[in-house]
């Protein structure tokens, strides 16, 4: 997207504290921006080599977090945390740079990739005690800022019910703190009179389980609504109606096409998104019939306006392949102990849909070591009518609804030119 806009003469600025963008596997897409600003120290950012000795860290439930402990000691007050620094930098860019581009008649994109409210759910007071004032550090220990990743937290004994309440409270604290600092950006939009000629989009990539179904974090289970259903806010002067709500199926893929339309730029022909402008101006009530979601090697999900279908792979989860244009950029280093196999002599060069050159294709068979993100505590086929059953309690597998969504999933995969292996793996051939 940024490369397309930059070629069209749009100034693009990235402001972020998202550490994964700058790791091996991040693909260096930040270099496509006109300029980028990285605020250091979130989660596992390799920023500092030693911690403040007065900071002992917090319980990690078996996962080491030395990198964050090293960074955390350098946050002297709330404004030093990565989230507040990111929002401050974004507001400063709006104040100090955006007016120059407006006066010069140069369109601009400010992309604020804020990692919060991601774990660690670490905040200073008064946020830390705001939603659980009864937590006594002298008795209960430090605030719990690292949630476990499990499909059975309390049930398995990974955490107690009391610890679960504390984790939810710390998530709320992190959410409230970053919401407060996001207000600084919105205040600057007010101060610069930007609302009349600026499209503002607020979205996120995924949710976080906080005890729903006793799931915590982002474990290897199907994508239920708390993780999959994300918020989206758009203000488009002269197009959207302030304060209105649109009941339509959208996906983050659509934001690419939406931004291209906002800037008057043609989207690449192979892009899968659809502009959301017709929903905003009222000229349409729907822009897509389906949306896809999933995690490599696990279930593939398809949704229409009212239903969701998670189809698990059949039998031995084969054929399964991983495709990469540069295996050396795969995130091997992120969690080397959590299984990321190198390619072997079965790897071949093959073409992915839309690729102009062959890429590495590594097949996997039952018994192979799989990447850590493909780990599944359980895989199952699920079908829900979200309009009638928003809590996803009644599995409609075996009903006519499943047959209809089988057909829809097959149609969607064919429409995006998914490899034939994907349909075979899911038993859709």
Model region roles, listed by residue range:
Residues 1-76, 295:
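Catalytic-site neighborhoods of secreted/periplasmic enzymes
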Residues 13-14, 20-26, 44-47, 116-123, ...:
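Short catalytic/ligand-binding loop motif for oxyanion handling, primarily in non-cytosolic enzymes
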Residues 21, 83, 87, 196-198, ...:
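Polar, surface-exposed loop/tail segments
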Residues 23-37, 71, 76-138, 190-199, ...:
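Active-site regions of oxyanion-processing enzymes, predominantly non-cytosolic
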Residues 81-102, 138, 152-198, 262, ...:
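A long, amphipathic alpha-helix that forms part
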Residues 120-133, 188-247, 251:
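Histidine-centered active-site microenvironments of extracellular/periplasmic hydrolases
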Residues 165-177, 219-230, 240-257, 263-274:
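A short beta-strand-to-alpha-helix junction
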Residues 224-225, 295-397:
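C-terminal, low-complexity/hydrophilic appendages and adjacent surface loops
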